[in-house]
Amino acid sequence: MKIQSARKLGFFAALSMLVGSVVGIGIFFKNASIAATTNNNGYAWLFAWIVGGIISLFAAISFSEISFLKQTKLNGLANWSYQIGGKKSGYFVLFSYGFYYLGMLGLILGIFSSEITIWFFQTASGSSFSFPFWAHILLGAFFTILFVITNYVSVKFSGYVALVSTVLKFVPLIVAVFAGIFFPTTHNAGGSSAFEVTEKNNFDFSKLVLALPAVLFAYDSFLSVGSLHNKVQKANKRVPLIITVGMILIVSVYTLIGLSSALHNKGTISGLISDVFPANAVRGITIFVAVFLLISTYGVANSLNAAFVNQVRDLVKLNAIVGAHSLKKKYSNEKVTIFYLIITLVFWALVIYIPSLAIKLPKKDGTGIGYGSDVIVDSMSNFPSLIFFGVYMAIIVAYSRKKIKYPNSIERKINPKLYWISAIISSSLILIAVAAFIYSQIYAVATQAHSSSGAGVFADNGLMLTNIGSFLIFITQILIFVSFPYINYFLISKVDKFDLFDNFDSAKIEKAE
């Protein structure tokens, strides 16, 4: 085996990176907020998982053909966008995916890692000791830096971490699925069936729609392995299969977890297991689950940061971020890459940390206001996934048009019927979901502006984010997503004094390194 090949990810390591980057944070952290958003109505709760699963699965099948497109100096989503839409599309996705999507979520997952770590120690020790949110920010920053350094030093080692964590994280999920479904009427921890509809939890379609961003967050990152295309052995052959197999597994597990959770009206895996098993076994089972949840969270953060590091490397390599071209004249590519990893994380630290600590938030019980909560962080984590599912839809539609107009330009294809069914279903549902979400958000602000948006995970500290607060976060992220690539392009022309799109000419980019 060549040294270059030995440093790359094999099929199972890459599959583990994919599954590891998807399974974990979403199902462990978002299930409770999805339950809250749907008002604990079992049908809306379960259907939200099913709709999100259908969208994600068919999108993944569509991308299993799209990922056959030839490799360039770009990786994954940016490469596919370039091949289909040209240099401007390739640049836009490269910058947005690296700086906006991965940069922000990498930092947010650090905070979630802190929360699950403290919850683990509280569970293991049997004491609910105080841990302020500012401390979660500090510990979260440590985790983010650790995962970035690990992946910067060796993506191969990161692949082994993903492989181990992926196997282990399924243990509590499998236990929860079988226990919850096989014992639907057993309630040892105050559970009940969320399918028993009362006046307090009537089915509301708009709330199902409002839950979709959290669901799509749980399913998202299924294309992260594409961002590691140049790190996967026999990538052109294996990446499509990895995406399809991985998503079938994930959608199956998530749907069963959604059903199991609704049968017991428990939004957390630990709560679900505690409701099924006898009270005298709850502590031991909860500690058992906490260990695997901890490993799972670290695995997700590790896998996402692997994609983040690789994407920033691409930005620097192509001088696609302001100042990179000038800095590379004085410093090595490695030093410049480290600089932009730091700059990206610092920017998002300011955007995330300051509002989370400084903004006044109303208390859930209506007794006043408070500071320091993860509700803003949780809300911010939902919208990148929703926005990028819109990007996925645009790529699928553009590729489908190319497939019709220039059929001979498509060298490798999956079954035609399978592709078209998947492309039509996924793109249609994504469009409907995005449009319905925007409408539901506006409606929620118009009718219940100061009601809870349902955001918050382990450290909400009794505070809530209102519907209008959630809407403002969504609008802010849309503005950043749309405007920053243009601002970056303009600054490059002034600071580095060259036309960035020259670097995306076919002669310079279409030869893989």
Regions found by a protein language model. Give the residues of each.
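Membrane-interface "cap" regions at the ends of multi-pass membrane proteins
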Residues: 1-46, 50, 56-64, 485-513
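Select transmembrane alpha-helical segments in multipass membrane proteins
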Residues: 8-18, 86-100, 140, 201-212, ...
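TM-loop-TM module centered on a large, flexible mid-protein loop between adjacent transmembrane helices
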Residues: 78-86, 244-302, 320-380
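Hydrophobic transmembrane alpha-helices that form the core helical bundles
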Residues: 58-69, 73-140, 148, 294-311, ...
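Transmembrane helix-loop boundary segments of multi-pass membrane transporters
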Residues: 35-43, 121-133, 156-165, 273-277, ...
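Helix-loop-helix junctions that connect adjacent transmembrane segments
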Residues: 3-7, 39, 124-125, 129-135, ...
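Membrane-water interface regions at transmembrane-helix termini and the short interhelical loops
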Residues: 143-168, 226-231, 399-410
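C-terminal membrane-solvent junction of multi-pass transporters and transport-like membrane proteins
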Residues: 329-334, 389-442, 464-469
